[in-house]
Amino acid sequence: RGEKLVTNPAESSQTAPDRGHIYTCGYSSASMRIMASRTSEVHAKFLLPYLRPGMRLLDCGCGPGSITVGLANTVAPGEAMGIDIAPVQLDLARAHAAEKAVTNVQFEVGDICDLPFPDSAFDAVFGHTILMQFQDPHPALAEVHRVLKPGGLVGFREPIFSNNLAEPPGSAQDQLWKLFGRVLAYNGGDIDMGRRL
């Protein structure tokens, strides 16, 4: 298929060819545990004061649904919809919602750049570390705008990893963040997307 395994992204082009969506964090058990530990109270705290009961909310790139389920509780009796490109994530999300007995939430396969919803379908759209997967977030944001009701609410939480402080410089943690940034850039993402919003 013309694909090449790159073990050292520093030796390759920093511009990724168009290979479709590549989720740099991957789906290892460690990565999935980290994603499942996220909560709306911490990771969507900035958005919570603006949400109201009865809203219809979309969570783009919902992963295992831990944030989505919390947002569903906030907008109840409204609805929350979580989308992700990885069915394995959605299986975990559905199980999490069932475990928490949250019934006003649904999960389905979806791509933020081609949302499977009609125009003006949501009162609010949220995303956590999803726009960082793209060098150009405009196609994703255009889709968000399309499915958002007039006057709707948009909230994305994106990183600015260049502001991370790892001491001492050159430590394993410092090297890890730099490597992650190079791999993310190679895969078509931007480790400092938060700076661009």
Q: At which residue positions do the language-model features occur?
A:
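A short glycine-rich, Lys/Arg-flanked "PGG" loop and its adjoining helix->strand segment in the class I
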Residues: 138-153
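Class I SAM-dependent methyltransferase SAM/SAH-binding core
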Residues: 19, 56-60, 64-114, 139
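A short acidic, Gly/Pro-enriched loop at the edge of an enzyme's catalytic core
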Residues: 113-124
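Conserved catalytic/acceptor-binding region of the Class I
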Residues: 155-197
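Class I SAM-dependent methyltransferase Rossmann-like catalytic core
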Residues: 16-39
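Conserved alpha-helix/loop element of class I SAM-dependent methyltransferases that forms part
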Residues: 37-55, 70, 74
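A short SAM/SAH-binding and catalytic strip from SAM-dependent methyltransferases
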Residues: 123-138
